[in-house]
């Protein structure tokens, strides 16, 4: 089968040609921007909570900030999510669980580290048992604070959405 689409020649079996055609369409700017818009406004996080930042995130979900209006819908099962929120200190034992949860998430997937403990270990920074998320996962956004204010969390969500829409997010491998 031979077909020409503005310089793209598809030769071979139907499956291979279809895969190339889909990749060509996805790489076109209008379709990519629609796809990135859809991903940006359907961030469904799985919370990996090991410290107090998880309680502070509840304030972000409350009516005053209402992150659900930004398409931020929490889910329980990692196979239904595309954003991992690490909230708290990661020990070596929990790091294995974090990687296991991350590997279950479908593509494209993103990671945010929330709080001083998640960023660099917090008060446990020099412990032998602490693992920084950036050493085991591709962290997209860091939210500083102990715990971070709800405004900072909402701002981080907006920053991630902007990076996705611009195609600059680490998790966009497609």
Describe each PLM feature range.
Residues 76, 81-88:
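Short, well-ordered secondary-structure micro-motifs within conserved domains or adaptor modules
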Residues 52, 86, 90-95, 99-103, ...:
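Metallocofactor- and cofactor-centric catalytic cores in central/energy metabolism, strongly enriched
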Residues 66-69, 80, 93, 97-100:
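Non-catalytic alpha-helical scaffold/packing segments enriched in small hydrophobic residues
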Residues 1-79, 105-109, 127-130, 135-142, ...:
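Iron-sulfur (Fe-S) cluster-binding modules
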């Amino acid at each position: 089968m031979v077909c020409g689409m503005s310089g793209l020649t598809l030769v071979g079996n139907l499956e291979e040609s279809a895969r190339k055609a889909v990749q060509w369409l996805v790489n076109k700017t209008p379709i990519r921007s629609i796809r990135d818009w859809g991903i940006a406004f359907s961030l469904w996080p799985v919370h990996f909570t090991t410290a107090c930042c998880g309680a502070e995130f509840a304030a972000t979900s409350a009516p005053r900030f209402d992150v659900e209006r930004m398409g931020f819908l929490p889910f329980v099962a990692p196979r239904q999510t595309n954003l991992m929120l690490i909230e708290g200190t990661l020990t070596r034992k929990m790091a294995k669980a974090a990687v296991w949860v991350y590997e279950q998430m479908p593509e494209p997937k993103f990671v945010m580290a929330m709080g001083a403990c998640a960023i660099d270990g917090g008060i446990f920074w020099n412990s032998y048992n602490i693992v920084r998320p950036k050493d085991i996962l591709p962290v997209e956004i860091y939210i500083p604070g102990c715990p971070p204010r709800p405004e900072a969390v909402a701002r981080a969500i907006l920053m991630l959405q902007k990076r996705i829409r611009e195609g600059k997010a680490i998790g966009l491998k497609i």
